[in-house]
Amino acid sequence: MHKSKFLVGLAVILIASMVLASCAPASAPATQAPAEPTAKPAQPAAEPAEATEAPAEATEAPVEPIVLAIEHFSVIEGTTWSGAQDRAGKRLAEKYPNVTYIFRENVAPDQSVPFAEDMIANEGANIVVGNAEFMGMPLKDIADKYPDVNFVSIVASDVSSKENFIRTFPRQYQALYLEGLIAGALTETGNIGIVSAYPNVQVIRRTAGFYLGVQDAAELLGKDVKVHVKYAGDWYLPQEERDIAATLVDQYQVDVITQQTDSGSPLDVATEKGIWFVGKDMDIVGEYGWSTTDTVAVSFDTRWEVLYDQIIQAMMAGEKPEQIIYLGMESSMQLADGTDELTVDIMNDGKLGVDAISPKALPLIPQEIVDLVKQRREQMMAGEWDPFTEHAFVSNGTGLDMEGNPVPAAGTEVKTAGEEPTVEWLLSQFNFDLQGMNILE
């Protein structure tokens, strides 16, 4: 009797508890993201995974804003160096919703720090780039004052750095090597001219890449090709550059000309004289329309955004960027529109690779050179080949004497073939012209 009453009571309690349970709200949805009151209703108990993901979303930190500030040493409009840097800032801002690009133009060395501090204080800049070494190096002096800001300076020959003072440069010599192959094949007189700025590590390194390409083309085709270099004295001296270009054509029978200067004068002379021009830094036909492929045989394009993207990616991951960033054709990034682009590449009228060779020039270039351009480009993209590793470096006896690093005597083999030079050596100690170059007074 007592046992029966007990069982009846127990049944009533169980039924009541089931009714109450069916009326109560589920406990898991109460922990779902409170910041999203319009979130979907809780999933049935059979799908518990959905309910356990929401708390992680609720605690996810917001993406920190990044303000990329570039200090340009020159004006932007109509320039290949600062123009390419400005394009880089715009492309990065297009790619990342949390990245803003700001800039200053015509920044002198004594202005780089005041401009930087102004952009940090008033516009939230946390990456500040000096796009030339002579006006980027002063930023090193304030790096300790702003530990949360990454300062960047382009390398000319000084590779000093700090945890938040980053040095960078692209391996433009790789694209210049490909240009040299094309130039060496195109010349009919056997004379190629370079209008150059002044002896410095950056100029010597870039010229060496071009020269090695010329010599490889000459060897493959059984030609004797000379490269004549004359210095203007600075990067932007339009009249001096014009005079040098005319001298190279008139006195040295140059029929292919290029430059390591910044004015359009050498291109103007090439157009007037009816010879081939090889461009630098940007696709001057496709980007600016300065000329046509009837004069510009090929150019190369520098994508500084690939370098700066390394810094942005590190910051977004909460990491410190590398202190020296020296990337080449093996490195790339995807733009906002899905385009994959290399750090540097030969480019002409919007076309890349062997397609960048002028349609007018292409029939004049033997197929074995076209094939070699394609092969070497693909090998460099894969990181399997590099002209500076492949070739020996033998001194011409000319170049730039540096403190503790005089120009090696003519005929001195400084680097053997197959030896990979260090990044530090290439960026700061490569101070001699390669054997066979004609450096004019």
Predicted regions and their residues:
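General helical secondary-structure elements
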Residues: 1, 36-40
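Bacterial lipoprotein signal-peptidase II cleavage site
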Residues: 21-32
